[in-house]
């Protein structure tokens, strides 16, 4: 479908333009295109439960975690709010039962403000509601980060922005009739405001134990009829 491939071309170009121009990042953007084009070919049905987001979503085996083949992974490493917005079509076209969205930390790493991130998430929410009004939407809070590993400094040095996003995300969910799921408070160390090192080995991504905790938090929402 030339229309669809043209659409993806735009997504890909936007990702490419947004990336710092060095070899590793250029290579990374080819992964984005590989995954986005795969998702365009994989059908979504009204029985499906979609986990949508960036590398943190990308990194999990959701169907195995929930022992449910209708739970589908639509995470792409490196994704940002507008990247998710641009690739909604093949998802909402299938009118999935539920969408669990977790997005924003890569926008934080680019210096984007909490207000701007929320405004872009609200565009995602409105598009889902418009194109697939029966889909139940769950907005998951952005996870805390931890700068003690000296990795992903663009993300982890801006750890305070995460709380600002979450403080605005819950009212957005209420306003738009979506459910808000607070992951943040389960993963954060109260005394530092940073990700509990039990759940990460780089300050940004999750270890197996982190995915099990995430599963335990969202399972009631996944199982809800």
What are these regions (language model features)?
Residues 52, 57-70, 81-119, 127, ...:
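Oxyanion-hole/transition-state-stabilizing segment in secreted/luminal serine hydrolases
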Residues 132-136:
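A short helix->loop->beta-strand "cap" motif at the edges of active sites that frequently abuts
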Residues 18, 144-225:
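Catalytic His-Asp segment of secreted/periplasmic serine-dependent ester chemistry enzymes
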Residues 114-124, 159-165:
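Charged helix-capping and loop-helix junction motifs
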Residues 16-95, 194:
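Serine-esterase "nucleophile elbow" of acetyl-processing enzymes
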Residues 7, 67-69, 176:
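Short, structured coil segments at secondary-structure junctions
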Residues 73-77, 106-114, 155-156, 200-204:
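Second-shell loop/turn segments in exported
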């Amino acid at each position: 479908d030339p229309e669809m491939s043209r659409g993806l071309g735009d997504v890909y170009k936007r990702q490419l333009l947004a990336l710092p121009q060095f070899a590793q990042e250029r290579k990374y953007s080819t992964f984005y295109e590989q995954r986005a084009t795969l998702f365009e070919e994989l059908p979504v049905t009204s029985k499906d439960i979609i986990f949508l987001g960036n590398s943190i979503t990308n990194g999990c085996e959701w169907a195995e975690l929930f022992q449910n083949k209708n739970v589908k992974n639509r995470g792409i490493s490196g994704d940002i709010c507008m990247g998710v917005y641009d690739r909604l079509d093949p998802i909402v076209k299938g009118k999935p039962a539920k969408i669990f969205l977790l997005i924003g930390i890569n926008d934080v790493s680019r210096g984007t403000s909490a207000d701007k991130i929320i405004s872009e998430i609200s565009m995602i929410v409105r598009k889902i509601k418009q194109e697939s009004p029966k889909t139940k939407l769950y907005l998951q809070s952005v996870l805390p980060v931890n700068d003690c590993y000296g990795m992903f400094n663009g993300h982890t040095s801006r750890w305070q922005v995460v709380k600002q996003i979450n403080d605005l995300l819950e009212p957005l969910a209420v306003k738009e009739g979506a459910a808000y799921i607070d992951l943040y408070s389960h993963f954060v160390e109260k005394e530092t405001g940073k990700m509990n090192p039990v759940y990460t080995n780089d300050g940004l991504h999750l270890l197996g134990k982190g995915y099990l905790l995430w599963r335990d938090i969202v399972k009631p929402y996944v199982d809800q009829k």
